[in-house]
């Protein structure tokens, strides 16, 4: 079964607090506990960006935690991931990411229930972020009629548009969304 999530932000003091945890360690333990429930023989995890808070130290801490998972993982990078092209010299981190993830990309395409689904960290172009501002517009995909799974917004609502599903942890009770759950949202 494929699972989708975004915006883990491991070791992030502010996000830990906003999500109701006393410390980043407690936050990370709760997030990782949900990921440990995935079966490495049957499941696959797609993380749609922002595993960390940004910066090399944060990146290495997040990668070390994620490396303890045995489930196959793919990353669609987000703006807080040093591997994303919005950051300086992202290529210098590629080997470290590929030691943990089977693939690392800025955007991907999947087939879910016969539908073509775009996978991106960012919502469709024209969708404002949670602060009602246009940011990272050069990385937002235009809506050409496909469904989109994304993160970035940290929205509690799962549906973010006519053909968009947000897989940020906030929308899924701090756990990854299964392909079956995503397909339900797409109905």
Language-model segment annotations:
Residues 92-187:
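Conserved beta-sheet core of the metallophosphoesterase superfamily
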Residues 3-5, 10-111:
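Core catalytic region of metal-dependent phosphoesterases/phosphodiesterases
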